[in-house]
Amino acid sequence: MSAKDERAREILKGFKLNWMNLRDAETGKILWQGTEDLSVPGVEHEARVPKKILKCKAVSRELNFSSAEQMEKFRLEQKVYFKGQCLEEWFFEFGFVIPNSTNTWQSLIEAAPESQMMPASVLTGNVIIETKFFDDDLLVSTSRVRLFYV
């Protein structure tokens, strides 16, 4: 095992996504929240989010995570897949993570134009969000969450 692989394993071992919520960015109202560690690789997670989230012009995502390890440049790359085809890609950067810290990270996700939005009935169960967790260029974990619109 290379030093990079070992480092990625150490970071992942000490990393936990404690909770996450999604809010309507305009009103601040929480639309969905969960405490499952959606960063765990190797399993397909599921999230049931309200259909009305699709009507929001922007969604504010708040992540609370703990890390035993220091990270120089913690960042996420996310891809939204519909029936296996990538529809959207997002990039988020948190930056430096203090070792043995718990952090809350808020990000704004702008919606696709309404003309490009598919109805919840078509999307539900067919959308997977793949999240890659990085420390700079070092891939730490890849997780997948299947979305159901309720």
UniProtKB/Swiss-Prot annotation:
This is Retinal rod rhodopsin-sensitive cGMP 3',5'-cyclic phosphodiesterase subunit delta. GO terms for biological process: visual perception. The keyword Cytoplasm applies. It is a peripheral membrane protein. Residues 144-150 are annotated as: Required for association with membranes. It holds the Pfam family GMP_PDE_delta. Signal peptide: none annotated. The gene is PDE6D. It is found in: Cytoplasm, Cytosol; Cytoplasmic vesicle membrane; Cytoplasm, Cytoskeleton, Cilium basal body. GO terms for cellular component: cell projection; cytoplasm; cytoplasmic vesicle; cytoplasmic vesicle membrane; cytoskeleton; cytosol. Promotes the release of prenylated target proteins from cellular membranes. Modulates the activity of prenylated or palmitoylated Ras family members by regulating their subcellular location. Required for normal ciliary targeting of farnesylated target proteins, such as INPP5E. Modulates the subcellular location of target proteins by acting as a GTP specific dissociation inhibitor (GDI). Required for RAB28 localization to the cone cell outer segments in the retina. Increases the affinity of ARL3 for GTP by several orders of magnitude. Its main location: cytoplasm. Belongs to the PDE6D/unc-119 family. Retina. Interacts with the prenylated catalytic subunits of PDE6, an oligomer composed of two catalytic chains (PDE6A and PDE6B) and two inhibitory chains (gamma); has no effect on enzyme activity but promotes the release of the prenylated enzyme from cell membrane. Interacts with prenylated GRK1 and GRK7. Interacts with prenylated INPP5E. Interacts with prenylated Ras family members, including HRAS, KRAS, NRAS, RAP2A, RAP2C and RHEB. Interacts with RAB13 (prenylated form); dissociates RAB13 from membranes. Gene3D superfamilies: GMP phosphodiesterase, delta subunit (2.70.50.40). InterPro entries: Ig_E-set, PDED_dom, PDED_dom_sf, Rhodop-sen_GMP-Pdiesterase_dsu. GO terms for molecular function: GTPase inhibitor activity; small GTPase binding. Transmembrane segments: none annotated. Keywords: Cell projection, cGMP, Cytoplasm, Cytoplasmic vesicle, Cytoskeleton, Membrane, Sensory transduction, Vision.
